[in-house]
Amino acid sequence: MILMFDMPTDTAEERKAYRKFRKFLLSEGFIMHQFSVYSKLLLNNSANTAMIARLKENNPKKGNITLLTVTEKQFARMIYLNGERDTSIANSDSRLVFLGEAFPDET
């Protein structure tokens, strides 16, 4: 899922709403690609539907929020015209991720 948003930040109340929404996105596991462009890997349509429901519950009163659902394969084919691809584990579509130190070679 790719989420793009544009929210006003003119008043203290609007800035507070912006910070609250951004914190919500991060707490839900979204990764920031650019300012106001976030993504989250959702493994199936049920997870996608549930995430949309949570986003609707935490929808700020002002601004524009756009969602785009793409497959893992489509996301992996994203073209970077400038800058580098984020290769962190958090941005991986791998089903199995090993965390911690590498095991020594037992040969």
Swiss-Prot record:
CDD domains: Cas2_I_II_III (cd09638)
Cofactor (UniProt): Mg(2+)
GO MF, one annotated term: RNA endonuclease activity
UniProt keyword list: Antiviral defense, Endonuclease, Hydrolase, Magnesium, Metal-binding, Nuclease
Hydrolase as UniProt keyword: yes
EC class name: hydrolase
SUPFAM superfamilies: TTP0101/SSO1404-like
Record carries keyword tRNA processing: no
Annotated binding of Mg(2+), by residue: D6
One annotated GO biological process: defense response to virus
EC number(s) from the headed UniProt entry: 3.1.-.-
Function comment: CRISPR (clustered regularly interspaced short palindromic repeat), is an adaptive immune system that provides protection against mobile genetic elements (viruses, transposable elements and conjugative plasmids). CRISPR clusters contain sequences complementary to antecedent mobile elements and target invading nucleic acids. CRISPR clusters are transcribed and processed into CRISPR RNA (crRNA). Functions as a ssRNA-specific endoribonuclease. Involved in the integration of spacer DNA into the CRISPR cassette.
NCBIfam families in the record: cas2
Family statement drawn from the similarity comment of this UniProt entry: Belongs to the CRISPR-associated endoribonuclease Cas2 protein family.
HAMAP family noted in UniProt: Cas2
Subunit structure: Homodimer, forms a heterotetramer with a Cas1 homodimer.
Protein name, UniProt field: CRISPR-associated endoribonuclease Cas2
The organism's taxonomic lineage, starting at the top: Bacteria, Bacillati, Bacillota, Bacilli, Lactobacillales
Annotated gene: cas2
